[in-house]
């Protein structure tokens, strides 16, 4: 049985957020992000992260699902405190940057306001 450790919804899409997605990255930040950062982010209504992010968990973005393949050293802390992480759709087994989560699967083409973000332990 899957155990949901995080659940939220996209509330706003920054002007340049789609550009990052085209480059294989999705940047999340909670509501209230500084304006200069929010322009590049998919802003979400932040929830409590019930457990640290780990390799093997599944993240759902809208209707798509992805396996987490690497977790940066500060990704869980940043996500818990700031609602901020960068997701890279490259399936790397080593995190490039401390705040990055790498996921396996086809790069998401679009995410909409109201789409759900969910992270589960399988």
Go through the PLM ranges and name each one:
Residues 1-24:
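N-terminal, charge-rich interaction modules
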Residues 27, 91-122:
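Helix-rich interaction surfaces within compact, conserved domain-sized segments
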Residues 37-48, 94-103:
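Short, structured beta-strand/loop micro-motifs enriched in basic residues and often containing a Trp
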Residues 51-53, 59-60, 111:
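Short, well-ordered loop/turn sites that connect or cap secondary structure elements
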Residues 57-67:
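Short coil-to-beta-strand transition motifs
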Residues 64-65, 71-77:
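Short, conserved beta-turn/loop elements at beta-strand boundaries and strand-helix junctions
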Residues 75-86:
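Short, solvent-exposed secondary-structure boundary/capping segments
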């Amino acid at each position: 049985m899957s155990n949901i450790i995080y659940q939220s919804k996209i509330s706003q899409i920054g002007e340049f957020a789609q550009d990052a997605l085209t480059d294989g990255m999705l940047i999340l930040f909670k509501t209230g992000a500084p304006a200069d950062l929010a322009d590049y982010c998919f802003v979400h209504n932040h929830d409590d992260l019930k457990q640290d992010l780990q390799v093997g968990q599944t993240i759902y973005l809208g209707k798509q699902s992805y396996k987490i393949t690497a977790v940066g050293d500060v990704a869980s802390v940043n996500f818990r405190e700031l609602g901020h992480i960068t997701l890279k759709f490259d399936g790397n087994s080593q995190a490039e940057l401390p705040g990055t989560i790498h996921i396996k699967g086809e790069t998401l083409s679009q995410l909409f306001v109201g789409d759900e973000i969910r992270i589960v332990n399988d």
